[in-house]
Amino acid sequence: KVFAIDILDMEKIDGVNFFQISIEKIEEIEEIDLLKGKFNLVISDIAPNLTGITAVDCANVLDLNHLTISTAHKFLEKGGALIMKTFQNNNLKSLRKNMELSFKLVQTYKPAASKKQSGEIYIYGVK
């Protein structure tokens, strides 16, 4: 099964169960909550609305990343993987160290499709 959650509406995709809800409330969805520890992959491209104030934006990104890691840790099976969007900033090193506490393999990568000047990167972790 494929589940998608987002605070914004999403176009229907065959085979995808979509829930318009914040990640903070994912455990309120019984169909998903019953599958704790059974997901083999969690993909997150969550990003906050950017303010242009670096300190605020970095803190907001970090908060969402920690929420994503916590959620993935609850729902992933052993050997399951997390792919999470984040941004290159002063918090990246500590974020990666935090992930290394819960995941046996952690790697960062920048997709070829991402613009060179963009700070967007992805962190991959295997539980």
Regions of interest found by a model, annotated:
Residues 5-51:
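S-adenosyl-L-methionine
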Residues 60-78:
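A short glycine-rich, Lys/Arg-flanked "PGG" loop and its adjoining helix->strand segment in the class I
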Residues 81-85:
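Short catalytic-loop micro-motif centered on adjacent basic/acidic residues
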Residues 86-127:
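Class I S-adenosyl-L-methionine
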Residues 50-61:
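Glycine/threonine-rich flexible loop motifs
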Residues 1-3:
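Short beta-strand element of Class I
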